[in-house]
A protein has these predicted regions:
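Acidic/histidine-enriched segments that form metal/cofactor-coordinating
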Residues: 1-52, 142-145, 149-162, 170-174, ...
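Non-catalytic accessory/assembly modules
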Residues: 3-21, 28, 39-44, 63-66, ...
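C-terminal regions of mature proteins
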Residues: 68, 224-389, 401, 512-618, ...
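A generic structural motif
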Residues: 68-72, 132-135, 188-196, 208, ...
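Active-site-adjacent "gating/activation" loops or surface patches in catalytic cores
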Residues: 118-127, 135-137, 161, 368-413, ...
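A structural supersecondary motif
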Residues: 127-132, 152-191, 445-454, 639-641, ...
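Active/ligand-binding-proximal structured segments within catalytic/core domains
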Residues: 139-151, 394-439, 483-486, 648-660, ...
Length: 815
């Protein structure tokens, strides 16, 4: 947990969110870090921990819900007999006291760390925050989110645009937190100057006054409520279980009133009421009451300090040294003995007789059949269509898949930029970008631009990159939905360079935040790009090369803006061509009628002019890099390809992945090493990696990776242990699929040529795993380890201590 929170405190965006809560609620539990402040965690005693846990993690302080097609009496009886009856009732006062509203707006200044040699100009976060209302107000719960979108978040929204036009920060974003007892609204200008604080506040407050005086855009209100209503009716939680997500939403009210668990789940009536109020002064009145007249506000300014992480580490070392100096020899020896006992406990496996008490499925209980594709080829050779006949509850899921294989190397990285432009919107031939955004949400459930890379299942050297334009809609809106996609893909106007710069700056800021919070993903894809064609292609659009291009374009925008516009126009001519397009559609048969005709109308307007086609071939070479950050932890990746060493992919590797994640890597990298997590992957194309997450170590972790093959070859698993790992592997394969996900899964099989026969063979191999088969898989691990591809993202000083590991080291974020 200590290293988890050191990692969390290394992300400036996380620091800002934390300080916002502290600024608004200084006298309540919301003003404290629930995960633990790493500067304070060393002060926690074991006795305090046990006392807290015994009081608050007691069933008397729990909320229990049931979900699914079940007999409540049966399950409640089981819970009572097997669990609750074992405890005495305990009176626990866990009610969250409310923060007394401020008499006047507060101003809070805090700091975050950047690299020691960072100039730290224009890297300040300016935030304006307002506490408002109660999470038990079912209308305000949704209306706050509506106002966030309409005023401060959507493309062209008035408060956001006013700040952008004034040049305050390179990204402006806002959100509302409605799931706490005292909800709040926050708007942030990222990468601003501290000197802009007063202007930042005055622009927001002046713009809010204008909004009340002149009124809110009714079409924007309708579009936002339509979007919320579509999302509510669709109830698509992706790979997350529906019952879990509904339970979490129930907590937004249930935690604060035990009689109101369902008020936010039953949102349909609330949405209808809010729609009826669009033509009234309801929303302007909310702005006046909560945004303008309300004094419970905090302006939180978080400024960069070069080398702050190092200074804090030195302060901690001095504190611990002082504590050590005050200890007697007996006290020191007691600490040494306790540490040895802890290490012994960490290495000691749980007794098998205890593990045997846990109920376990048997292999024969598990589904034998692989999940089937739902694919039907329709259309024609000139206008191919892939259809997934799946019940969707009245929603059509359309995916226009454009082959990007023939985009020249000089234009290929611009695919990522084009994707962000189509997501954040530019003006088109027939709409302003804000009007287009509203039209999309009024007539559809939204659009999404996706870059994918499909690896051929029969020839792993063949990859097909695609640009995919997706939308979803009610069946009677299919023509309008396709028309709006056409507007984006064909009629986009790239000549507004001011808007282009705004998008580039926001895209760069978003990438930076993602790279800081998901360093493990960054390190893994970078390490694999040294040898893997598919990873190298992906990295050009989603990885470090994309970020470097954004750095260059934003830094030298005036010199490069004409080149940027020309490249975007040329890229569209390579991508959006009739011969590149596959119509991919998910709906039941009654929703199919007319979709081919609608897409054919778009197809006829695609580019047909002559171009010099070439196949994009990325360069792969060993680089073994270290990327230096101001963070307090590392993300350590070691990668390679076992198929190149003559070893096959087998379904048993899915079982090994689970075993490594819950056994060897869990115990050695997390439990013993102190990292918050460690993951591994074994791809069908042979690409494999180990990567740690929020890791205090570097070389120690790499040594642990290097010993993995010997551990696997020597492990002695029993049938119960193997079955546990098989269950984990099956659960990953059999995650419930929504209709949209089932369609995308089926498309993946079609694009890669991965047959059902091969999928079934892999599942059979998975279910037939024995201890001996697991031992044999140590060869695959040894094979990819021998290739020694390494990438580490982490603390600059820590990486410099291990510089001999790297062929190159550079700062991840340049000034």
């Amino acid at each position: 947990v200590y290293n988890e929170m050191k990692g969390a405190f290394s992300s400036p965006d996380d620091v800002v969110s934390r300080e916002v809560m502290n600024g608004l609620y200084p006298d309540t539990t919301y003003g404290l870090e629930s995960g633990g402040d790493p500067e304070v965690i060393p002060e926690l005693t074991y006795e305090e921990f046990l006392k807290f846990h015994g009081k608050y993690y007691h069933p008397s302080n729990s909320l229990i819900y049931l979900y699914g097609n079940l007999d409540p009496e049966e399950y409640l009886t089981f819970l009572d007999e097997k669990y609750l009856s074992s405890y005495e009732t305990l009176e626990v006062d866990s009610a969250i006291p409310l923060q007394k509203p401020f008499d006047e707006k507060r101003c809070v200044k805090r700091e975050y760390s950047v690299m020691e040699d960072d100039i730290a100009e224009n890297e300040t976060y300016l935030t304006y925050n307002i506490a408002m209302g109660s999470s038990l107000d079912r209308e305000l719960y949704i209306a706050m989110d509506v106002l966030v979108h309409v005023l401060c978040s959507d493309p062209g929204s008035p408060v956001k645009q006013a700040l952008v036009d004034a040049g305050i920060g390179d990204e402006v974003y806002s959100y509302s937190e409605t799931g706490i007892a005292q909800p709040y609204f926050s708007i942030t200008a990222k990468n601003a100057s501290s000197a802009q604080q007063e202007q930042f506040v005055s622009i927001i407050e002046e713009e809010l006054q204008k909004i009340v005086k002149h009124g809110i855009d009714r079409k924007a209100l309708l579009a936002t409520l339509n979007e919320f209503e579509f999302r509510y009716r669709e109830a698509d939680f992706g790979s997350y279980p529906r019952g879990l997500m509904l339970g979490l939403q129930a907590l937004d009210s249930w935690l604060y009133d035990k009689e109101k668990p369902f008020i936010h789940i039953e949102a349909n009536d609330t949405l209808a009421v809010l729609k009826e109020k669009i033509e009234t002064s309801y929303y302007e009145d909310l702005v006046q009451k909560y945004f303008i007249d309300n004094r419970h506000k905090a302006v939180v300014v978080v400024e960069p300090v070069p080398g702050l992480t190092g200074k804090k580490e030195e302060e901690l070392a001095d504190r611990l040294a002082a504590i050590k100096d005050r200890m007697t020899e007996e006290e020191k020896q007691a600490v040494v003995d306790a540490t040895k006992a802890l290490h012994a406990y960490q290495q000691e496996p749980s007794p098998k007789e205890d593990l045997a008490k846990i109920p376990l499925l048997k292999r024969e209980d598990m589904k034998k059949e692989a999940a089937a594709y739902v694919n039907e080829e329709r259309g024609s050779k000139e206008a191919p269509a892939l259809y997934h006949n799946i019940f969707t509850n009245g929603i059509g899921y359309l995916n226009l898949v454009f082959d990007a294989s023939h985009v020249p190397a000089r234009l290929f990285p611009y695919i990522g930029i084009l994707k962000s432009i189509f997501t954040l919107m530019v003006d088109t031939e027939h709409y302003s970008y804000s009007d287009l955004y509203n039209e999309i949400r009024i007539h559809t459930g939204g659009t999404k631009m996706v870059f994918n890379v499909y690896t051929n299942a029969k020839d792993m050297a063949k990859v097909k990159p695609t640009f995919e334009a997706r939308t979803k809609f009610l069946f009677n809106q299919k023509d309008k939905a396709v028309e709006l996609l056409e507007e984006i893909l064909i009629h986009a106007d790239f000549t507004d360079t001011k808007r282009l710069y705004e998008i580039l700056a926001e895209y760069k800021s978003d990438m930076q935040a993602t790279m800081q919070s998901a360093g493990h993903s960054l390190a893994a894809i970078r390490a694999m790009s040294y040898f893997s064609k598919s990873a190298a292609v992906t990295e050009q659009v989603n990885g470090i090369p994309q970020y470097r291009l954004l750095e260059e374009l934003t830094k030298n925008f005036e010199d490069r803006k004409e080149e940027l516009v020309a490249n975007l126009k040329e890229l569209c001519q390579y991508l959006f061509r009739p011969e590149n397009l596959l119509l991919d559609y998910t709906a039941p048969e009654e929703g199919y009628a007319g979709i081919e005709e609608a897409v054919d109308r778009l197809r006829k307007k695609l580019y047909t002019g002559e171009i010099a086609k070439e196949t994009y071939e990325p360069v792969t070479e060993k680089k073994n890099e270290g990327f230096l950050t101001a963070g307090q932890v590392q993300y350590v990746c070691r990668a390679g390809n076992f198929i190149r060493e003559g070893l096959p992919y087998t379904g048993a590797l899915r079982v090994l992945k689970v075993m490594m994640g819950y056994d060897y890597l869990w115990n050695q990298v997390r439990v013993v090493g102190g990292a918050y997590g460690c993951m591994c992957s074994f791809g069908r194309n042979g690409d494999a990696y180990f990567v740690s997450y929020r890791d205090p170590n570097l070389e120690k972790t790499i040594r642990t990776y290097e010993q993995a093959a010997d551990y696997i070859a020597g492990c002695r698993l029993d049938e119960r242990e193997v079955t546990q790992f098989i269950i984990g592997a099956v659960s990953e394969l059999d995650t419930p699929m929504t209709p949209a996900v089932k369609g995308i899964y089926s498309l993946g099989g079609y694009m890669t040529g991965l047959s059902m026969e091969r999928l079934q063979k892999e599942r059979d191999e998975l279910l037939a795993v024995t201890p001996e088969i697991i031992q044999g898989l140590g060869r695959q691990v040894a094979a990819f380890m021998r290739q020694d591809y390494i990438c580490v993202v982490g603390n600059g000083n820590k990486l410099k201590e291990s510089k001999e590991l790297f062929m190159n080291m550079e700062q991840l974020f340049r000034s």
